[in-house]
Amino acid sequence: MKYTIIENRHLTGATWLMRLRGDTSGISKPGQFVNVAVDGCFLRRPISICDWDDSTILLAYDVVGEGTEKMSKMLPPQELDILCPLGNGFDISVPSERPVLLGGGIGTAPLYGLAKALMNKGIQPAVVLGFASKERAVLHDLFVDLGLPVYMATVDGSLGTKGFVTDAYKEAGLDADYFYACGPSPMLRALCDVMPVSGQLSLE
């Protein structure tokens, strides 16, 4: 299906933000993703849906290879062939009053749509995000704009707690009764070891 680019801008480091106009009627849950076809590349690129409305989707992506490099050069009103939506997404029907959202790197992206979905149910989640450094921290301002408590961790200590998402969670002293997490495999494994409550995991 064809989607029209209406915005494609650089955020920081290797991260870009792209907004597209097209059919979003199939998107039913936060945490779903799309597969993007890029001219000259055999494989489609899987990218998490950051946010969506009745006619647009918002994607945050890192430039890590030929396909995403080509995406970063595209301008409105170019079109992309996209399979949308894919994946099971997060189940927000799980009873929870004090959930925490835990994101690492570009895995932060789908948690934004998740935060908005929870808020629409009257639930105010806490947000804990981890990055390599202050320069690579992305999208945290979106959660701040929602009025949510946001706790940060960076490996080099340049922003927030020095260390990882798990360190920032412990330092924040949050009393969460459920968690949702998206990020790299090592982060998710660490969370499974330290989180005292059950939750849902999604690979970035």
Q: Model-predicted segments: where are they?
A:
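Ferredoxin-reductase
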Residues: 2-78
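FNR/FR-type flavoprotein reductase catalytic core
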Residues: 66-204
